[in-house]
Amino acid sequence: MRRPKDAFLSNPGRIYCFTDSVALGRRLLEAGARMIQLRHKTADDAAFRELAVEMLACVRSFGDAVLIVNDRVDIAIEVEADGIHVGQEDLDAREVIRRVPAEMIVGVSARYPDPAQSAAAAGATYVGAGAVFATPTKPEAVVIGLKGLRAVVAAVDIPVVAIGGITHGGIRPVLATGARYCAVISGINDAPDPAAALRRLLAESASFPTDQDR
């Protein structure tokens, strides 16, 4: 029986990737990605469903990798994705958790400690906290900085995925806050060679001790 939550929580890689295409997703998986979020804001439901089915088949071929769908709960359930990620302003976390299978990963965006605690109390698997730094992916995002990230980490006892402006050279300061994973979009996807960029980030994260090592 596949246990997505176990795979997510025990994953030794500390880089959380994003894709809007199977081609990019496969390149990242081949480079070592084991956590990928499928995120395509402009695709209609039919196109996104088809993309999700294809991407899930690709992820399954890599064994221990997991695919998390952004926002589209119905499609995540229908295609039996490993997880769903929702923004706190988009959908009620309790309602999402009530609807999805028990083994499905549920991530919730939470910029500050109070909403992070609410997400954890609702049963979220992890919270996504940021933007840690200014980011070209979402220029309007409020920047919480390392201090704000540290406050979110201290407020919950579930993993925190840090997001926003994280690039090569910035992994260790982020992980030093206690965040479990670093989500990287533009630092990988906009690089001349996304696979090489991911490998550099994975190497940087591997040099930082895990909770089990300390």
Predicted regions and their residues:
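Conserved N-terminal beta1-alpha1 strand-loop-helix module at the mouth
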Residues: 1-93, 97-126, 141-144, 151, ...
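Acidic, Mg2+-coordinating phosphoryl-transfer loop and its flanking beta/alpha structural elements
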Residues: 180-184
